[in-house]
Amino acid sequence: MNRGNALLVLAVFVVASCGLAYELIAGALASYLLGDSILQFSSIIGAYLFAMGIGSWVSRYVADDALLARFVDLELLVGLFGGVSAAALFLLFALESAPFRLVLYALVTVIGVLVGMEIPLVMRMLHRRQAKFSDLVSRVLTFDYLGALAVSLLFPLVLAPRLGLVRTGFLFGLCNTAIAVWTLWHFRAELGLSARLRGAMAWRAGMVGAALLAGFAASDRLTHWSERALFGDEIIHAISSPYQRLVVTRWKDDLRLYINGNLQFSSRDEYRYHEALVLPALESVRGARRVLVLGGGDGLALRQILKYPQVEHVTLVDLDPRMTSLFSHAEALVALNQHAFSDPRVTVVNADAGQWLQTAADMFDVAIVDFPDPSNFSIGKLYSVPFYRLLSRHVADTGLVVIQATSPYFAPRSYWCVDATLKEAGYRTWPYHALVPSFGEWGFILAAPGRADFRPPTTYRVPTRFLDADTTHQMFSFAPDMPRPQVEPNRLNNQSLVRYFEEDWHGVLR
């Protein structure tokens, strides 16, 4: 294989890598901003592949003597549209009246059509250069699939967590532009263009490359602007991990944590949430010495648990080390959780909660389950019958489990699905709720795998700002406008809770 053919085959590797990268960026961005990762990735992939098919069909109309020139144009267009896609979508989503979904799928379609034209053009160029057809197909497809493999590994493990979606988009746009420049230079004698036209193409390539380089350099600023517009407050911490996007904002004395764009707490009223989550269970298991926290990487549930001097050990299991590190070291956040992670009674385990429960042998008097809302299947499995059965093996016969369970007012089917799932897993349950102004009416469920009775506490042995005998009594009483609907338990094979959650919140949130 001569040098020109080898370089064209190498271009296939880069083209395939970039094409899959834009698909992954669009899917990840849609999941981050719109939720429901299964639906978003499925629809993005379907639209992208359909558009690639259109592009492959359209490529037949490119004249043989214009293949190289059109390939250069394609690479510049793919680099431009693909490179700016993440930044443009981030900024667009922050505009309330913007047609985000329309623009998202329009971009996916345009990029898909352009990418779909690339490989057929390369194959035709190689065929015209006397490459044997059987060798041509095998080499092109081999490097096509190798490029896809490389990006499918690098994107979730390195690129997205270290560079972020916006900078990753610009990086791959630069790769497409580099292929265009290299093709323009190496095959300049075969382009069949005048020096003036070649100069115009080089000028266009330079402009696209300069724009993408500027975007790459300004990626953090662009992300900050878009998230500032989205959240409305000053951003004091913004971290991308392999698992999620963490953003902490501040307005006056109000600190707020967002995970993948969803509010997790406001420092103005989080004490209501965390007192309601933790204190009824710990007051009801008077001799609780060992406590398990699943999730809760902000340390705010820990703060409430550590008020009890009889608690000897707390194990906190949170998937994301970036989360627990942030709330262990950032000054304002450490002050909020009152240095909970520095308490010698606390052990932090950064692991998947389900996998940790399968291997651990520890037993606990109280288990606090404070996972994010079940907005996708990866979180929904942590609200399933098998998970709760696994958890019950680690709770003492007289112990209690408490679970944050979304809103019984805004998401009634989701809330009562958690209750039904716990019952299906063999627990007795005592549902309750509390008003948290930043969330609205929020729900929790106390559950016991062994004990048969529970009475809401009438006094608290630790200082409280929200709970007393009256508020506790009210928490365990449901008004007529929060009835229990008919729901099915959440099992791994149906993930009904994720469906309920999406349907309940549709129309409540954007």
Swiss-Prot record:
It is a multi-pass membrane protein. Keywords: Cell membrane, Membrane, Plasmid, Polyamine biosynthesis, Spermidine biosynthesis, Transferase, Transmembrane, Transmembrane helix. GO terms for biological process: spermidine biosynthetic process. The chain crosses the membrane at residues 6-26, 38-58, 74-94, 102-122, 140-160, 165-185. S-methyl-5'-thioadenosine binds at residues 244, 318, 352-353. It is an enzyme of class 2 (transferase). Belongs to the spermidine/spermine synthase family. Pfam families: Spermine_synth. Residues 207-456 are annotated as: Spermidine synthase. Catalyzes the irreversible transfer of a propylamine group from the amino donor S-adenosylmethioninamine (decarboxy-AdoMet) to putrescine (1,4-diaminobutane) to yield spermidine. Its EC number is 2.5.1.16. It catalyses: S-adenosyl 3-(methylsulfanyl)propylamine + putrescine = S-methyl-5'-thioadenosine + spermidine + H(+). HAMAP family: Spermidine_synth. This is Polyamine aminopropyltransferase 2. Its main location: membrane. InterPro entries: PABS, SAM-dependent_MTases_sf, Spermi_synthase. Gene3D superfamilies: Vaccinia Virus protein VP39. It is found in: Cell membrane. The active site is at residue 370.
